[in-house]
């Protein structure tokens, strides 16, 4: 039997979460008649998620949490050790290529869920990691979402972000930049989980628990103070990576390189070759960089037909070397 979401709850959700009002009227109406679905990581044959069903679940849950402060406190305690669930339950992600519904609940496919668990394992064990990724797999979005979770739930935490150019770290209004991603995630989060925070250029501060996310660019990476973890975005493409390594060495316990490949012999490649590939549930080996690979085959929407069509296009245009780097990780 089809469950419905109370009209009052729907109206409250859209009034309390103003950015979602941008939905078309027919989308809002459709949510009222949807079977709520509690989001979880999906396998290939389960993809894509029913995003309206996720919003329907959120609406019902928010109505319960707002009416029961003790239950809300319990929910916050539960989520404080489960970043993957908090992200899927309450964060949104963005795809500008879609004609409509560009914002959607951040429901993971399996490899994304494993990546968030990988990040938490690194922090819990004080190890460094490396993410070798193909393009368009959501690795940066997953890392931004994890950073926001940590900002909210880990008191007095300090997370660093760096990339080779300042505009890649933060550019107001550009969701391709790292800090704009995180500002947008916070902007779209329900008020019951949202702390009092301040978001300025390359810095986000949680005023309630003292946690901070800070950004740096180019040769300045690693020179802004100590952090619990530091994300180096597209680190295979840095101009002077050894200089950055020297700065970061004593400033963080957990350094995370996230990048597509960029040839042989650079710091990213050497670290990748010397590392140990991480596996879910396997004890992390101390002293080795933990390696996490996201391949195009991990993405449910990247089929063999997609691969063949994309490769043929690059071949016609004389760009197979770019395809090999960005898709094949070669």
What are these regions (language model features)?
Residues 2-330:
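Phosphate/NTP-binding elements of NTP-utilizing enzymes
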């Amino acid at each position: 039997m089809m469950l419905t979401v109370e009209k009052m709850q729907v109206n409250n959700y859209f009034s309390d979460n103003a950015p979602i009002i941008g939905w078309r009227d027919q989308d809002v109406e459709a949510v009222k008649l949807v079977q709520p679905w509690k989001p979880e990581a999906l396998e290939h044959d389960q993809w894509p998620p029913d995003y309206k069903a996720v919003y329907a679940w959120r609406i019902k849950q928010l109505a319960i949490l707002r009416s029961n402060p003790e239950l809300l406190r319990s929910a916050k305690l539960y989520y404080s050790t489960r970043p993957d669930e908090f992200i899927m339950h309450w964060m949104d992600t963005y795809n500008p290529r879609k004609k409509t519904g560009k914002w959607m609940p951040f429901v993971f496919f399996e490899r994304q869920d494993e990546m968030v668990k990988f990040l938490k394992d690194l922090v819990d064990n004080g190890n460094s990691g490396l993410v070798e990724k193909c393009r368009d797999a959501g690795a940066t979005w997953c890392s931004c979402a994890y950073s926001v979770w940590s900002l909210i739930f880990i008191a007095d935490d300090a997370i660093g972000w760096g990339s080779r150019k300042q505009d890649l770290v933060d550019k107001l209004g550009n969701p391709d930049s790292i800090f704009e991603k995180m500002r947008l995630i916070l902007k779209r989060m329900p008020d019951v989980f949202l702390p009092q925070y301040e978001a300025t250029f390359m810095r986000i501060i949680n005023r309630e628990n003292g946690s901070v996310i800070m950004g740096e660019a180019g040769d300045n990476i690693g020179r802004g103070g100590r952090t619990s973890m530091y994300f180096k975005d597209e680190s295979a493409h840095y101009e002077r990576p050894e200089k950055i390594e020297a700065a970061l060495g004593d400033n963080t316990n957990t350094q995370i390189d996230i990048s597509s490949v960029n040839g042989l012999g650079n710091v990213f490649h050497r670290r990748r070759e010397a590392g140990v590939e991480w596996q879910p549930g396997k004890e992390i080996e101390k002293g080795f960089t933990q390696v996490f690979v996201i391949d195009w085959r991990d993405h449910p929407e990247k089929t063999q037909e997609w691969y063949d069509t994309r490769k043929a296009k690059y071949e016609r245009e004389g760009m197979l070397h770019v395809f090999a780097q960005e898709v094949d990780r070669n």
